């Protein structure tokens, strides 16, 4: 899962361009995952990456390091919540047709245990809960290398269709 993470996050930029807008969302995500399309800058900054993609389900992997430390010496809760928000959004993106995007309306999360920096690779799995014409909801769980639950959350996303 984490063997070639540096390959996966070596290219940073915007994956959604006029050219990629002709592709289904799942193909864009697969391109980001395999390195043919750039990873979002936030992923490089917080050291997480897409490790699995299928329709309605996305898995991110990430390793919190020194860049994620809060003033008390633990990993800032924002690291977990950012992974949850990213994974939930990408789960929604995985079902979108070409030319259709999304934006997060709300993400709620619960942190269930503290994360220590440099404690290994964490896994954030997101799945769709409901798919409507304009609103998608998804949920995610963040588990540690020990298999324990560290956080969970849900996102409400709005589908953005081209105007005109």
What are these regions (language model features)?
Residues 1-164:
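Terminal targeting signals and extreme-terminal segments of soluble enzymes
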